[in-house]
Design a protein with these regions (language model features):
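Active-site-adjacent helix-turn-beta-strand microarchitecture at beta-sheet edges
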Residues: 1-12, 115-119, 137
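Feature captures C-terminal
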Residues: 38-226
Length: 226
């Protein structure tokens, strides 16, 4: 029976879904965002950006939800089984409305909530168009600064629509602020969103890891948010 199901799954796993220009990895960069995490955030935003899909303006992806690198074959092809290896949990996307202050509080939890600490931070990847800076030398609750959306400052009073997985929306990975907002619009499965993004955008290049800036004494700069 197991062999029968395995044989039936092989054609699905081998189905091409798109192309990449280079391997897209989950290894974090200096700011602790990752190219593959950023790609998934972009795919989630693409799937939820229209008004009927939730009207999302920003998307977040938790690093623990990215389970494998995306390495193409010699022709640059990526297959469905590889996408499944990257996102195997079957989460679905949701969109919630947050104030800028709530987003700031949620981002502070990357460094100060449960097992998320300055020594072992859990930095979310973000979709293109959104960016911010953080400084781990500052005290808890004051580490996030310079939040911007499409080049404009994101104030504490602003209201924005944010896409994420139902796991993250429920407070997963110690992001309890996300669970404090009850309104929610349910969407499709995360894996379907990633496949649709590849079909719409191939060939896909590895996203730059310049959406978030980690401020240090030697490099107190803000991100380019591209």
């Amino acid at each position: 029976l197991v062999a029968t199901y395995h044989a039936a799954a092989v054609p699905l796993a081998q189905r091409p879904v798109g192309q990449v220009t280079a391997a897209i990895l989950r290894q974090p960069g200096p700011s602790l965002e990752s190219p593959l995490g950023n790609l998934i955030a972009d795919a989630q935003l693409h799937a939820t950006r229209l008004p009927g899909q939730g009207g999302a303006q920003i998307s977040f992806m938790n690093p623990r939800g990215v389970r494998a690198d995306l390495v193409p074959d010699e022709q640059g092809l990526v297959r469905y089984g590889q996408l499944f290896a990257v996102q195997p949990f079957g989460n679905h996307l949701v969109v919630k409305t947050f104030t800028g202050a709530q987003l700031r509080a949620a981002l502070e939890q990357q460094f100060d909530s449960g097992t998320n600490t300055p020594e072992r931070p859990r930095v979310l990847s973000v979709s293109a168009g959104f960016g911010y800076s953080y400084d781990l030398s500052r005290p808890a609750g004051a580490r996030i600064s310079h939040m911007v959306l499409h080049g404009q400052p994101l104030t504490d009073e602003a209201r924005v629509r944010v896409a994420m997985s139902n796991y993250l929306a429920g407070g997963g990975d110690n992001f309890t602020v996300f669970a404090q907002v009850p309104d929610m619009l349910g969407g499709g499965q995360d894996l379907d969103a990633l496949e649709a993004y590849f079909r719409a955008s191939s060939p896909v290049a590895p996203p730059a890891t310049n959406r978030i800036t980690r401020i240090t004494r030697s490099a107190p700069a803000t991100g380019s948010n591209q």
